[in-house]
Swiss-Prot record:
It is found in: Virion. Homohexamer. The tube first annulus is composed of a gp48 hexameric ring. Interacts with gp54. Part of the baseplate macromolecular complex which consists of gp5, gp5.4, gp27 (central spike complex); gp6, gp25, gp53 (inner baseplate); gp7, gp8 (intermediate baseplate); gp9, gp10, gp11, gp12 (peripheral); gp48 and gp54 (proximal region of the tail tube). The lineage of its organism: Viruses, Duplodnaviria, Heunggongvirae, Uroviricota, Caudoviricetes. This is Baseplate tail-tube junction protein gp48. It comes from the Viruses. Keywords: Late protein, Viral baseplate protein, Viral release from host cell, Viral tail assembly, Viral tail protein, Virion. Baseplate protein that forms, together with gp54, the baseplate-tail tube junction. The tail tube first 2 annuli are formed by gp48 and gp54, which are in continuation of the spike complex. Involved in the tail assembly. Morphogenesis of the baseplate is completed by association of gp48 and gp54, which bind the upper part of the baseplate dome to form the platform for polymerization of the tail tube. InterPro entries: Gp48_T4-like (IPR024389). One of its GO terms (biological process) is viral tail assembly. Induction: Expressed in the late phase of the viral replicative cycle.
Amino acid sequence: MAIVKEITADLIKKSGEKISAGQSTKSEVGTKTYTAQFPTGRASGNDTTEDFQVTDLYKNGLLFTAYNMSSRDSGSLRSMRSNYSSSSSSILRTARNTISSTVSKLSNGLISNNNSGTISKSPIANILLPRSKSDVDTSSHRFNDVQESLISRGGGTATGVLSNIASTAVFGALESITQGIMADNNEQIYTTARSMYGGAENRTKVFTWDLTPRSTEDLMAIINIYQYFNYFSYGETGKSQYAAEIKGYLDDWYRSTLIEPLSPEDAAKNKTLFEKMTSSLTNVLVVSNPTVWMVKNFGATSKFDGKTEIFGPCQIQSIRFDKTPNGNFNGLAIAPNLPSTFTLEITMREIITLNRASLYAGTF
C-alpha cells in the first residue's frame, strides 16, 4: 500500500539536496558583452521550411566582434588574427544547421583561450548583420624609387667616383662634358630608376547597409547597432600611465647616480630640482582606444566564395548613419518621424599590414 503524506512546509524543506552540496562550475564574466542583430531573431532563424531563400537569408551575414586589447605590438596583433581565424572556423562550420547554438558560442568569445594576457577573455560586442551592400576587397602596395648613378655612388660628388690622382687629372674635362658639351650635342646622362617593393598598405573596407525595420524590435536593433559602433569607435582620454612610469625611472636613476653618492647620509634626497623638471610627465594627457574589431563572414560558404578571409584586427575610421525622414508617416507608427529605411555606412581600417604568411592565416 502506498503511503500518502501531506505536503507541508517542513516536508518541502527536507526534500531535494542542500544548496551547499555543490556549486556551479561556471565562473562569473567580468566583461559585459553587448549583442545586437538585424533583423531581430536572425540568429535563431533556423527555419524548418523548405524555402531555400528563407534559410539562406538567416544563415549568411557578417559578424563583427570587438575585443579590448592592451598590447599593440606586431607579434600580438598577427597572432590574434591567426588565432581568431583558426578558432572561429570550427565554430562557424556548425552554422549550417544550428544557428542559435553557434551564436551562443560566439557570445562567449571566439578566442577566449588564446592570448589571455593581452586580449580580453570575453568580447565586448557581438553584432550580426546581413551581407554588406558594398563588398569590395582592395589591396594596395607601396614602392620606393631607387635611383643610382656614378655620382651617387661616389658620395654625391664627381671626384668621389675616381681616385684622388685620377680625379685631379680628369675632373676638368669631366665637368665640362657633363655641363655643356653633351647638351650641345642633344644628349643627356641617362640614369636608370628602379622601383623596389616597400610593403603592403593598411587595408580599408567600407560596409554599407540599407536597413528597413519591419517591427518595433527591428527599429530598436538598428538604433542599438549604430550606438554600439559609434561608442566603441571613440577613445578614452586620461593621464598617461607610461609617462608616469618614465618619470619614476628617471627620478630613481638621478637619485641613485648623482644625489646619493654626493650627498651626506642625513641630507634630504627627495624633492630635487630634477624631480621638479620631470613633474610635467605626470600630467601628460593621452587618448587610448583599446577596442579592436574582427570581421568575418558568418554562415554557410562554398568553394565559390574563395578562401575564408577575415578582416582585422581593425578599428573604425568613420561612421555615417542616415536617418533623414523621407516624408511624413513613412516609418513605423510608433516612430513616425523616423525614416522607413536607414542607411548605415562604416569604414574600417586594419591596424597592421599583412604579408603572405598572415593574409590567409597560412592556408594558401
